[in-house]
Amino acid sequence: NNMKSGALNLFLLMFISTLTGCTGSDEDSVEANAYAGEFKILALHGGGGSPEGLMGQPGMQDLMSDLPEFEFFFADAPDHDSMCDQCWYADPPGGKGEPNEDRTWADISIEYLDGIVQEYGPFYGILGYSQGCPMATVYIANSNTSFEKAFLFNGYLPTTHSGLNDTINEVAPLDVDALIFGGENDVFIFGVEELAGV
């Protein structure tokens, strides 16, 4: 497992450094000059998780150690009566078997993330883990915030929320370079192809 984590971190380091122009070349890079802000990553935990839980995962610890030039901001899902505890948005009212067509279902979290970006941004990238992946794609599709990179780990699209999914599909392809990762034994492995489609 440590070998897989190390290989993923090496790949991430190459992905980030290549696309930011940090290739060791003395020549100026268009990509390196395109982003002038600090290298901050907005990280979204999974449903039922927490910022501390995501931050404490061994793979995340390795990633932060391997990328000391990046600052990671771990957002906490808003605490709201309409949502489950530590979730970015609630399950559909009729359960996951009955897709929810409400296009505003994640507005509380979108507004919350807008506030985070305004107070702590700008952010170079957005990272989502599990339910943080669909929230990241919903946020990219429904806000005026732009990111250079998206890192989507073990996630999926909000297909049980057809209204939210429609807001993503209407603006697809999303204008952000993305690294999408899914583990072979992950219950959400189907999400890799879904996410790659937007």
Spans of model-derived segments:
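Secretory targeting signatures
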Residues: 1-34
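Serine-hydrolase catalytic machinery in alpha/beta-hydrolase-like enzymes
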Residues: 38-123
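The conserved beta1-alpha1 loop
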Residues: 42-47, 154, 182-183
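Short alpha-helix in the alpha/beta-hydrolase fold that links the catalytic acid
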Residues: 55-60, 164-165, 189-198
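Active-site nucleophile loop of the alpha/beta-hydrolase fold
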Residues: 77-78, 150-159, 185
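Gly/Ala-rich beta-loop-alpha elbow adjacent to hydrolase catalytic centers
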Residues: 124-136
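Acidic catalytic loop of the alpha/beta-hydrolase fold
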Residues: 158-159, 182-190, 195
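Short beta-strand/loop motif that positions the catalytic acidic residue
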Residues: 174, 179-182
